[in-house]
Amino acid sequence: SYNPFNKEKEIKRKSIEPSLRYSQHYASSSFSIAIGAENVRYDTNSFALDRTSNWLEAEYKLFFESRSSQSFKSLNPTLKFITLDTDSRHYASIDSRLISLNYNNLFLRNWYSGPDRFLNQDRVILGIEHQKLSLQNDMDLNLLLGKAFFLDNGYYLDGKNKRSSPLVIEFKHRLKGNFFSNGMLEIDSDFNKIYSSHLGLMFEHNKNKRIELRSIYKRLNPYINDMYWLDKELPISQMELLTQWSISDQFMVFGKLLKDNELHKSKDLSFGFQYSNCCMKVGLMKRKW
């Protein structure tokens, strides 16, 4: 009988990716270009995966700014081109799943979480970042929009071959003082459904002191392997509590609590501490699910 937990007992992974990058910054723009090659090899008990990929990336970004004594506004369009020469065969997934898109992930060369699967489509990515600061009423608003367009075949999502990615919208808004709201939407290219979203409230004193409560929704549930789960086709609806708090210059504590809104119980709890200095970083974490 089929057992989804009967995985390969031994997997040997080997990956090498040399690259060369050039960047230039101007008064109101920046340009960068990079070329590289990636070789990945997986050896398992039943098969071997050996893939080589050559790639090129070019990115151009404009900076439009408006300043006054009481406010600051910026609008930064970004255009990125990615082309690849890679093996187009589809191997069984070992380490990878299709990641949910946010603004930063949209500009990545690969949209899979591991190196054994690769998004091999040439594409153009358009993005816009808008920021508005006001010293008069302590307002801070960040808005990001992005979308990718495939030059050849699209990628397979939700049973369809898409020629463009979902539209990604993100925002972060200061409510008052150190309190913020943030959110993200991943909207279908036909604008008729939402693939994923999150909405949260956050207290942030600096990068090392943060508490965030957010709701998470994912219409699709792309697991790492093609396992048969009874709820595989159902969306994910969860609440998540994230904390990280520095107690000194070297020590930080952190934690994460995940609650499933359908099961009405906590399904993932992790906590720990981290020590870091100029030369090293070490931590200890406990996880229960």
Where are each of the predicted segments found?
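Outer-membrane beta-barrel translocator/pore domains, especially the C-terminal barrels
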Residues: 1-274, 278-288
